[in-house]
Regions:
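Surface-exposed beta-loop interaction hotspot
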Residues: 131-196
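Extended, aromatic/histidine-rich regions of cofactor-dependent oxidoreductases associated
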Residues: 160-162, 233, 254-256, 260-296
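C-terminal motif of bacterial Sec signal peptides marking the signal peptidase cleavage site
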Residues: 23-24
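A short, structured loop/turn motif at beta-sheet edges
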Residues: 248-254
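N-terminal cleavable signal peptides for secretion/export
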Residues: 27-78
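Flexible, glycine-rich surface segments
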Residues: 174-232, 238
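Bacterial N-terminal signal peptides that target proteins for export
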Residues: 2-14
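Forkhead-associated
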Residues: 57, 62-124
Length: 296
């Protein structure tokens, strides 16, 4: 009888110990996830405030065929910030060429002093610099624009922070991925109404509250990306929608869609941006209460 009693006591202790260990694992996992999201949030701010980020943008000027003058004078086609001379220069578009002329010397590619420069629409990797400013030509669809940056932009507040929903692990959802045939593209528009083409890669499907939802994914450079709107769009979250990245599917076609990492388009932070508009297929009739909230 004594042996049986001790056995029961041992079993009870083992059960409690296992429970504590499992509980400890659960807490550890939650803490690891919180650390992961904290790193994600810090990296977001670092990226936005970097030289290649969007907080330093101070101008966006769409280039038409022919000659356009720029400078601080309001009479110019492109009005630059007040620190620039009244008539600073011009850009002339002739077919597939851009001809820049300046009344003061500027730095080409942060290295060579120039007062004029010509390049083709296939060579958009050149930059021009003057004091704290830098500008270059970007292409969106079939349209071209001068994008102007100020690396001393006062909008780059050291206290800059992005508001988020509280972390909710239930919004880290296991879904399935159905790939499109290779080479499939889709055409959507940006906020200016310009058509833009994106490589569409497939459909991500998942369940929320027992209901099935799906979103079309595309490639953004090397990243698998989803852009979407939902019931919070325009209220608690940015009016233009949000996006998120996801990893490659496993061997069974499973993916993880983590809405806690849903982030705002650059347009939520700066007016001089050219964000895409999520296609109708990616407008969810559900409130995604996770990830970044509207920036004010």
């Amino acid at each position: 009888m004594e042996i049986r009693k001790n056995t029961r006591s041992f079993s009870f202790v083992a059960f409690i110990t296992a429970g504590i260990l499992l509980s400890g694992c659960s807490i550890s996992t939650a803490t690891d996830y919180e650390k992961e999201l904290l790193t994600f949030k810090k990296n977001r701010v670092t990226s936005l405030k970097s030289r290649s980020g969007y907080l330093n943008l101070v101008g966006l000027h769409w280039i038409a065929e022919g000659k356009s003058q720029f400078g601080s004078d309001p009479g110019n086609e492109f009005v630059f910030p007040k620190e620039f001379p009244a008539n600073f220069g011009s850009v002339t578009k002739k077919g597939d060429r851009f001809i820049f002329n300046f009344r003061e010397t500027v730095l080409l590619d942060s290295a060579e002093k120039i007062s004029n420069f010509t390049f083709s629409t296939e060579a958009l990797d050149h930059t021009f610099s003057w004091h704290s400013y830098q500008w270059f030509v970007i292409k969106r669809g079939e349209n071209y624009a001068i994008r102007l940056k100020d690396f001393e932009n006062p909008d780059m507040d050291p206290k800059f922070a992005i508001p988020y929903y509280p972390i909710d692990v239930s919004w880290k959802i296991k879904g399935s991925f159905e790939a499109y045939p290779p080479g499939k593209n889709r055409t959507i528009s940006n906020i200016f109404g310009h058509p833009i083409e994106q490589p569409a890669i497939g459909i991500v499907s998942f369940l929320v509250g027992g209901k099935s939802f799906s979103l079309e994914a595309h490639m953004e450079g090397p990243k698998r990306t989803i852009i979407f709107m939902d019931g919070t769009t325009g209220n608690e979250t940015y009016s233009g929608g949000r996006e998120l990245y996801f990893d490659a599917p496993d061997g069974d076609g499973n993916v993880i869609v983590d809405f806690n990492k849903a982030f705002n388009f650059p347009c939520a932070f700066n007016l001089f941006t050219t964000c895409p508009v999520p296609p109708p297929i990616n407008r969810l009739k559900i409130n995604i209460t996770a990830g970044e909230k509207v920036f004010k």
